[in-house]
């Protein structure tokens, strides 16, 4: 509720700054970015190599998001710093579904790992830029295992949705399963992350030309909107899996 109010208020401010009485879609888009990611830091300068790494990282997210049908849809990619992030990929769910299939979680894990996969493929090493991606991917995998019963452990709920000290053990939680089960939870979370990682790497290897092309576009334009992304994918004939 509070976030929606913030988005609406920020959109109204943006419209007023342009002397417009009506709020347009672009105002909501820009306000969502500001509320979720923080204000633009156009004066924030980074080294050329870091800028190149960020371009490939964000391109990796965008390409995986496009290729996997159940991943969140990518609407914008930018290498302009916002908040603490050096770049960002704005992705939103395609539909407001009340029921989320297992494949959507799996595809979203792969999309989140797409940036790190691009770094590894192009620069042969990874950076700290994927720390938030790893946190979110691990959270999805943990919920798949312990909350939704979407793992090889079967349809069973294993713990509450709170912060965990370890992957399979929660802080202040009354232990309802053995150390052996906790270890299996850890293994399942790691397996789901590994599956997503291998999927991201394989897809980017297959579409390496697209990765280079999009990174180059980002380095030249800094931001790619919906239409820019569609043009890249259409020009290079990139089809969804």
Enumerate the predicted regions with their spans.
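Soluble catalytic regions of large protease machineries
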Residues: 49-56, 62-241
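AAA+ ATPase "lid" subdomain C-terminal helix
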Residues: 1-26, 33-41, 62-74, 144-151, ...
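Metal-dependent phosphohydrolase cores
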Residues: 29, 35-36, 53, 81
